[in-house]
Structures are given as structure tokens and as C-alpha cells.
Amino acid sequence: MLKTLSLHACAAAFVLTASGAMAAPADDAKAHFQAIGSGDLTTLMSSYAANTQFNWVGGPLDGTYASAEAIRGVWEKFTKSQGPLKVTMDKLEESTNPKGSTVSANVQFEGKAPIKVRYVLTFREGKIVSETWQIDPKLAMAAAY
């Protein structure tokens, strides 16, 4: 009886630990956006896979970046020039299959001026492998309450 109870307790602890260890891609995307807003480079860089491709479309940082060093350089320039930003998200959607997940969202970063971005992140094995930051000044955002 005690052995059976111990096995059930161990199994329950394993399930709780395993399920708590992996956040949903939508949650990871939200954390990524918040890290951008707060300028937290450590959190930002820890979310990338080794072979991430980052496409920044529009604005002074326009380009494709394909190494951790290049991506860090972009975020260093951006966070230095912008400072802390208020982050507003709208229309966040997640698509998942066994090979990975894609999260898309309308995101507004607001500091010196509002920066409206159509964001697309692709995750594989819990890490970002593709990131697209599309600046879109006409992007519609839901009204904040």
C-alpha cells in the first residue's frame, strides 16, 4: 500500500514538474515582447536557438540578422536608443503542430514615439528559430481600457 502510494506521489510530482517546465509558445512570445520593452538583453538572447534568423523590416535597423552576435547588436542599438517601452499586444495567435509553433501578434512599443509592429515568431523545441519584426505605422490596435 505504502509503495503504491509512493509511486503515485512520484508520478504526480513528475507530471507537475514536466508540465510546469514548458511554457506555451504564446506565453514565451509575450515574455519576449516584455523583455524588449524592458531592455532585458539576457532574457531576449536566452530565447533564441543557435541558428535563428531575424528579419527586421522597415526603419533604421532594417535587415536580416543570422547570428547571435548580430541579433544582440540589433537589440543593443534598439534598447539604447529607445529606453524603457510600454508594451501593448493585440490579436496574438498561436499555431502549433508536432514540429513547432508560430505566434503572430500586433504589438505596439511606446516610449519616445509609438512603434507599431506586426510580429511573427517561429519556435522549435522551445526556442525562437525565426523572428520577423515588420514596422507598420498603420497597424490597427485595439483600444486600451
Where are these regions (language model features)?
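Short beta-strand edge/turn micro-motifs at domain boundaries
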Residues: 114-144
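Short, well-ordered alpha-helical segments enriched in acidic and aromatic residues
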Residues: 40-55
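Hydrophobic helical h-region of N-terminal Sec-dependent signal peptides
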Residues: 10-16
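Bacterial N-terminal signal peptides that target proteins for export
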Residues: 1-10
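N-terminal signal peptide c-region/cleavage motif recognized by signal peptidases
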Residues: 18-20
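Short N-terminal segments immediately surrounding and downstream of signal-peptide cleavage
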Residues: 23-42
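A short gly/proline-enriched turn/hairpin at secondary-structure junctions
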Residues: 53-66
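Surface-exposed, charged secondary-structure patches
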Residues: 69-113
